[in-house]
């Protein structure tokens, strides 16, 4: 079903692989905030692993994956042992919404289904609807925080961005963890400042 790409032959296979890849990069410098617990912490062990292969960029492909192809990919990720899988941007299309429903109905009880949405109320509501009934779900919201996107594209001040982040977080909680009809699901929230690499550190934290 999938077209395999020819692999490039290395002159000396594995010769340049690092024995300990963790030592390749300098550790991220923590941010000293006395009233916060996590910004100053350092990563000292392997983090949680999440597959995000099934969402976002796929929408821009000239020949995007069909639902049967997405299903095959999803089950391959389960075979590989992923416990957190970001499956879609369910508010982007009916295809993504329908595939999300398939993932929810076929995921093992120890696998979290993650979905992505912008910080806009109607999109958040549609996104939460897509994972209703999941055993474990992660709602991943993102918001423009870099100066270019926040100021030029969306015409928002830093105060506007913070207010929107709080508003959206409260909305997600009201639709999930605090909603009486959503208690069968173990809910988690992920928030991403966009683009984090171009966002001033003090503002992002």
Language-model region placement:
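N-terminal amphipathic alpha-helix/helix-capping segment at the start of soluble metabolic enzymes
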Residues: 6, 10-60
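Glycine-rich, proline-tolerant flexible connector loops at the mouths of alpha/beta enzymes
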Residues: 82-111, 115-116, 143-156, 192-196
């Amino acid at each position: 079903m999938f077209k395999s790409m020819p692999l490039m032959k290395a002159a000396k296979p594995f010769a340049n692989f690092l024995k300990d890849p963790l030592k390749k990069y300098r550790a991220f410098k923590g941010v000293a905030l006395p009233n916060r617990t996590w910004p100053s912490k350092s990563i000292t062990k392997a983090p949680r692993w999440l597959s995000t292969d099934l969402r976002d960029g796929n929408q821009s492909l000239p020949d995007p994956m069909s639902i049967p192809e997405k299903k095959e990919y999803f089950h391959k990720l389960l075979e590989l042992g992923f416990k957190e899988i970001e499956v879609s941007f369910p508010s982007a299309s009916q295809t993504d919404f329908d595939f999300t429903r398939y993932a929810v109905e076929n995921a093992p009880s120890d696998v979290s289904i993650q979905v992505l949405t912008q910080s806009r109320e109607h999109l958040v509501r549609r996104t939460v609807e897509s994972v209703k009934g999941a055993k474990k779900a992660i709602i991943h919201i993102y918001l423009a925080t870099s100066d270019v996107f926040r100021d030029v594209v969306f015409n928002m001040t830093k105060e506007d961005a913070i207010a929107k982040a709080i508003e959206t977080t409260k909305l997600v909680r009201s639709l999930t963890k605090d909603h009486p009809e959503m208690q069968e699901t173990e809910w988690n929230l992920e928030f991403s400042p966009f683009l984090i690499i171009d966002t001033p550190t003090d503002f992002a934290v």
